């Protein structure tokens, strides 16, 4: 016989994703596939997609945390593009990273030039 159906063999271990091995939520396998299909290089190492997935996950978590804070400040429970815009533009490093990015339906940061603000009079200063 061909040897199929024997009962003495070991059961195959449950498959474990590379994302779970790395402790990530982002899909390492999908990132690897996209790196291979994207013609970025002839070959892609095993560690490259893990590292890239970790970086993407970190940036996403950072933006979502700041956007969640912006939503909470506006007494909202759902993050909308406006909250993403406020989160990115109020953070110096994220603003530099995403400087050339336009967020649809994001609006603009509120900003009034100092010369347009009402002047403080002496009475207002003494009242304090």
Curated annotation (Swiss-Prot):
The modification N6-acetyllysine is found at residue 6. Belongs to the histone H2A family. This is Histone H2A. It is found in: Nucleus; Chromosome. Expressed and secreted by skin epithelium. There is a cross-link at residues 14, 16, 120 (Glycyl lysine isopeptide (Lys-Gly) (interchain with G-Cter in ubiquitin)). PANTHER family: HISTONE H2A. Gene3D superfamilies: Histone, subunit A. Its main location: nucleus. It comes from Oncorhynchus mykiss. Core component of nucleosome. Nucleosomes wrap and compact DNA into chromatin, limiting DNA accessibility to the cellular machineries which require DNA as a template. Histones thereby play a central role in transcription regulation, DNA repair, DNA replication and chromosomal stability. DNA accessibility is regulated via a complex set of post-translational modifications of histones, also called histone code, and nucleosome remodeling. The secreted form has antibacterial activity against Gram-positive bacteria and antifungal activity against S.cerevisiae. GO terms for molecular function: DNA binding; protein heterodimerization activity; structural constituent of chromatin. Monoubiquitination of Lys-120 (H2AK119Ub) gives a specific tag for epigenetic transcriptional repression. Following DNA double-strand breaks (DSBs), it is ubiquitinated through 'Lys-63' linkage of ubiquitin moieties, leading to the recruitment of repair proteins to sites of DNA damage. H2AK119Ub and ionizing radiation-induced 'Lys-63'-linked ubiquitination are distinct events.
